Amino acid sequence: KSYGWGGLYIGDISQPRGGPRLTGHKSHQIGLDVDIWLKPKAYTFLSISERETVPPISMSKSGGALVNHNWTETHHKVLREISKDERVARIFIFPGAKVKMCREEKGDKNWLRKVRPWWGHNYHIHIRLKCPDDAYKCQDQYPPPKDKESSEERLFKYKQFIGNQLHSI
């Protein structure tokens, strides 16, 4: 709320112990995943029908390789704040947003290691949580790799990938 958003819209969220779901992502079945929309929450309470019909807003263009006019500095700040939470292992978002944040972040960029470029996350971010301390059978993923390439190199590779995908259709 400190960034002028009334809160966050939560999309698919894992069941506490994983398990089958009627709809949604396969990855949301282990109890460690949540989707958060890239849209400022307008007001606190929504009716059931309003929750089902809130329109998503895309933040990307060029097949996810770039951000569009809907992306703001506040999105960047919100993702930085989420990444500071020790319970967060990874944040998945479309590649163009990761590139934009890498270019524009001032100071320590280490938090951006948690932000991973992944297709299909143009309207929302996907958060993977670390295993809770009391979940003795849960195994955390390996820590995110240190970024060895510049954001421009990653963008170039992603544009090549998108171009190859479009040519194969």
Which role fits each region the language model picked out?
Residues 15-66:
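Acidic/His-rich structured neighborhood in mature extracellular/periplasmic domains
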Residues 1-25, 92-114:
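Extended, low-complexity, intrinsically disordered C-terminal regulatory tails
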Residues 3, 26-31, 83, 118-121:
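Extracellular/periplasmic catalytic domains that process cell-envelope and extracellular macromolecules
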Residues 10-14, 33, 127:
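Short, functionally critical alpha-helical segments immediately adjacent to catalytic or ligand/cofactor-binding
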Residues 1-4, 15, 41-42, 83-87:
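Sec-exported extracytoplasmic/periplasmic mature domains
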Residues 4-8, 32-33, 84-91:
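Loop/turn elements at helix/coil->beta-strand transitions in domains of secreted/extracellular proteins
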Residues 46-169:
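Catalytic cores and adjacent binding grooves of peptidoglycan-active enzymes
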Residues 13-16, 39-41, 96, 130-133:
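Solvent-exposed coil/turn segments that connect beta secondary-structure elements
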